[in-house]
Design a protein with these regions (language model features):
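Core subunits and conserved enzymes of cellular information-processing
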Residues: 1-202
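Terminal membrane-proximal soluble interaction domains of membrane-associated proteins
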Residues: 204-207
């Protein structure tokens, strides 16, 4: 259920907030937006986002199968297919009417919630978030979200080249908000309590 909801929320942000104004916030979806823009003059409307998302994930799936095993890959395949499905069925509507700040804030919050839901299900939607999860296996002192920020930054630089400075700057704002929201969602689901008991009968309690 978390994967289903998370991918739907993410696709909504991509299709109806980020893509209409060229806001490249990272991920394979960001790369897909760039490819769509660059192929618009070759293919009518450019290469569809859902198609690019699926195509880019194939080599990552192979790596995940080797490193994480079938169980992790199974969840990730589901996430990737669902995200591509949502990107296919959700119509492109500019919800923010070209407002960059609203797109960065609103889109960042929505994307953060979506990513958080998917990660809570111990899965990813493929792409750079799956790459981040694989890398985190070897650098555990960094969170998946922190690693994701670095990779997404590289994608944003590519977006800077294609779409210009203004969208890239707002994309950075969106990425920051996304990371904070997804981190808060994940940490908020982890509950632990510590109790300090002061007593003269510590030996009896210890036994």
């Amino acid at each position: 259920l978390f994967i289903f909801m998370g991918t739907g929320i993410m696709a909504l942000a991509i299709q109806c907030i980020f893509e209409p104004i060229g806001l490249v916030t990272g991920g394979f979806s960001g790369i897909a937006i760039i490819i769509r823009k660059m192929t618009a003059g070759i293919v009518e409307g450019g290469v569809p986002l859902w198609l690019t998302n699926l195509a880019l994930n194939v080599p990552v799936f192979i790596a995940a199968l080797i490193i994480k095993g079938r169980k992790f890959l199974g969840r990730t395949v589901i996430g990737t297919v669902l995200l591509s499905f949502w990107l296919y069925v959700i119509p492109q509507v500019d919800l923010t009417q070209g407002d960059y700040m609203l797109s960065a804030v609103f889109g960042g919050v929505i994307t953060g919630i979506g990513i958080g839901f998917v990660l809570l299900a111990k899965a990813t939607t493929g792409g750079t978030d799956m790459v981040s999860a694989l890398i985190q296996k070897y650098v555990r002192h960094y969170s998946v979200v922190q690693i994701l920020q670095v990779i997404d930054g590289m994608v944003v630089l590519a977006g800077l080249y294609v779409f210009g400075l203004k969208p890239a700057l707002y994309a950075i704002v969106a990425i920051f908000i996304t990371s904070k929201v997804s981190d808060a969602l994940m940490e908020g689901m982890k509950y632990s309590k510590a109790a300090f008991i002061i007593t003269d009968y510590y030996k009896e309690i210890a036994d």
